[in-house]
């Protein structure tokens, strides 16, 4: 197994489990998003609320500061959401972003939201609200699956991966232009805004309700392990030269068909993503003397991701049909 295959997943889990690691994960200080043709005048766009009331790993002033900066550059008004969804958390909100709620070591993973909250969000969207729900690898899929189920979305809840040509599992999945449908989120307002590629950095798989558009179709043959130790055990078996088919059958299952979905729900709109890092801009810095170069992931490493994020917001807010 090549050392980089699971680096991102290991770092992300380290933040949840909080062991002492030599390397540091941080927002990339060099990432400064610009938008050539903003959809809205500065500070005049719809209100985008990024949830912070549910032990969210991605926050406005933290891991999602780059995403918030991108949206502000496009004219959106972005703020943190600090209230439960059934107690004021949906007031004066045009777009609700819920990203990796439920960061916890508790086993089994408890729901991040109460039944009353999931019912409130579903009713809000049905009445015209716009939801961007993002939940990636364990434990975030399990924490969010109750909310996802309100919209008919099934979550794999584990670690989705594909096999490389070298026979290694990789959780970094790149979606090229030829994989995409012609949904407005992909095509944008014109040819200059077309999404040419998207890269996901360690997430889960998804299955949508009838009629949902698959924005990011999982690679043919993609699979999912239930948690990081299981995925690591699989990689170790493969590295040791074990029977690949037997190891895959024992330690993984076929992935669900998507890592990104879009659909209407009543008078509202929903986008669900199975990976959150794609819309951030992160830096993994290794200690001096380690002989390892800094690693970037997110919009700073995959330029198509920023266009994808903007087009998602444009579709949710009606800039795109």
Predicted regions and their residues:
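Compositionally biased, low-complexity intrinsically disordered regions
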Residues: 10-11, 15
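N-terminal signal peptide c-region/cleavage motif recognized by signal peptidases
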Residues: 17-19
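Bacterial N-terminal signal peptides that target proteins for export
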Residues: 1-8
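Short, surface-exposed patches at the edges or C-terminal ends of soluble domains, predominantly
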Residues: 22-321
